[in-house]
Amino acid sequence: GYGYNDLGRDTLEKVYADIFHTEDALVRPQITCGTHALGTALSANLRPNDKLMYISGKPYDTLEEVIGIRESVGSLAEYGVLYDQVDLLENGDFDFEKIKEKITPDLKVIGIQRSKGYATRPTLSVEKIGEVIKFIKEIRSDIIVMVDNCYGEFVETIEPSDVGADMVVGSLIKNPGGGLAPIGGYICGTKECIEKCAYRLTTPGLGKEVGANLGIMGTFYQGLFLAPTVVASALKGAIFAANLFAGHGFKVIPD
């Protein structure tokens, strides 16, 4: 039940840390979905009177209740975490001027949503994310930058963690699970951030030491092995279908 000394689990987390070029990783079936992973990462690294700011506009609908944009029991707002937001410019770029203006002493975490989600704005490239992280770190190097990497894994040859993100967060039932992982999520990042995330996911003092894999660890490894091929096929299919329908006069994304 405890899952102590699970070599398969611990090795998988080393593999994720190696792939994402981070100090540590938390990859668990106990993380039920992407929203759960994001909620864990945020609540682990924010304290009362700290401020969270999203600089890619309003996040996914499901995160609104996590943050407290929409009132919800147990939200970050209920625990005294402040929230601010900077929308993207009309052309889809980051609003550097507004971001600089809103970097206040109480700002602890900056969130970036890589995917367009349910909006029609452009998805953010790793290059663009890297530029804004560099800009932020030059102003205040202690700010934690968390990137919601859902739907973005293995789409490019590098990940947000390669360009300065302190945490990258996602779901195994999306890209990195390769269509095989039945549940799970991951958080990759600095040793300090991941330790806090592990204590939040399980309990203080236990952290990464507990968490049985319940016999599904094989699907996590196999899914990760297949993930780049599955993602490439999905991208090719999307581009092909978009061009097919564009040829018949439909407005499409990607165009």
How should these model regions be labeled?
Residues A17-A41:
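Short loop-beta-helix segment that forms the pyridoxal 5′-phosphate
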Residues G1-T11, L26:
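A glycine-/small-polar-enriched, mobile loop at the entrance of the PLP active site in fold-type I
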Residues Y4-D6, T32-A232, K236-G237, A242-F245, ...:
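Conserved PLP-enzyme active-site core in the AAT-like
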Residues Y16-A17, A241:
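Structural element of the ATP-grasp superfamily
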